[in-house]
């Protein structure tokens, strides 16, 4: 059965949206993982009694002041949280559009049978 051009177009949009949604979900997951790693690092630093910690810089460990590193990590964590929130909003919008397109396509294709 040959699909009408408008249905083919909707199907193409649906597939593109599906790919975009997967990419957004993957990126969000990456940022969430980085955020958890940073939270774990801050947690470990708080357990430490030393005023200094080692920070990875270009493949080497550099001794740094613990409070400065905690401040840097806190700032990075805030940025990560904002990015995750942005991805969540994008994902939500795409999920809604995806469901609408899926429903539309099911109706149109269902009528053809």
Curated annotation (Swiss-Prot):
It comes from Methanococcus vannielii (strain ATCC 35089 / DSM 1224 / JCM 13029 / OCM 148 / SB). Keywords: Chaperone, Cytoplasm. The keyword Ion transport does not apply. GO terms for cellular component: cytoplasm; prefoldin complex. Coiled coil: none annotated. The keyword Chaperone applies. Pfam families: Prefoldin_2 (PF01920). Transmembrane segments: none annotated. One of its GO terms (biological process) is protein folding. Belongs to the prefoldin subunit beta family. Its main location: cytoplasm. This is Prefoldin subunit beta. NCBIfam families: gimC_beta (TIGR02338). One of its GO terms (molecular function) is unfolded protein binding. It comes from the Archaea. Molecular chaperone capable of stabilizing a range of proteins. Seems to fulfill an ATP-independent, HSP70-like function in archaeal de novo protein folding. Heterohexamer of two alpha and four beta subunits. InterPro entries: PFD_beta-like, PfdB, Prefoldin. It is found in: Cytoplasm.
């Amino acid at each position: 059965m040959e699909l009408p051009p408008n249905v083919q177009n909707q199907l193409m949009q649906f597939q593109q949206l599906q790919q975009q949604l997967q990419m957004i979900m993957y990126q969000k997951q990456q940022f969430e993982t980085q955020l958890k790693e940073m939270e774990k690092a801050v947690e470990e630093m708080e357990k430490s009694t030393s005023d200094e910690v080692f920070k990875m810089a270009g493949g080497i460990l550099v001794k740094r002041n613990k409070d400065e590193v905690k401040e840097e990590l806190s700032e990075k964590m805030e940025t990560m949280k904002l990015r995750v929130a942005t991805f969540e909003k994008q994902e939500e919008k795409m999920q809604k559009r995806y469901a609408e397109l899926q429903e539309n396509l099911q109706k149109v294709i269902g009528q053809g049978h």
